[in-house]
Amino acid sequence: MATSSTVLFLLLAVFAASASAATFTITNNCGYTVWPAAIPVGGGQQLDQGQTWTLNVPAGTNSGRIWGRTGCSFNGGSGSCQTGDCAGALSCTLSGQPATLAEFSIGGEHDYYDISVIDVYNLAMDFSCSTGDALQCRDSSCPDAYHQPDDPKTHSCNTNSNYQITFCP
């Protein structure tokens, strides 16, 4: 007969397996440097043309956002960007100036994701889920994106999916 600690361990193992992190692979295909930002995890960094940034986002992350900043100049972690700036910081902790947004919530029965240009369009972006639809936003009229808060543009993926964001696809 199993002990209570064995049963507890097995339950925790099952729960942990069902609520694992999602991997976000962010690629810059633009002919110029992009400084992606990510909240609430990730912060931000410089991505030269052809470079990739991989983020592990824990289950239970709600209202996550990733966006591309352009025309940036940083020195020692502070500076400014022409688009998508977040208070002059290289590593963002809050959203900043309006930009094309990849939005997501991870965990629960399903993951949810979308592209938003409600505030502004600043950069072409594809956002895809390993078990769902590939969203494309190539210009300000992109049909896959939210343009108004009540647009029905949220998509769902199976929990434990991984994601790909490509700037200038």
From Swiss-Prot:
InterPro entries: Osmotin/thaumatin-like_sf, Thaumatin, Thaumatin_CS. PANTHER family: OS03G0233200 PROTEIN. Residues 1-21 form the signal peptide. CDD domains: TLP-P. Pfam families: Thaumatin. The keyword Transcription does not apply. The gene is RASTL-4. This is Thaumatin-like pathogenesis-related protein 4. It comes from Avena sativa. The keyword Signal applies. Associated with resistance against stem rust fungi. Belongs to the thaumatin family. Keywords: Antimicrobial, Fungicide, Pathogenesis-related protein, Plant defense, Signal. GO terms for biological process: defense response to fungus; killing of cells of another organism.
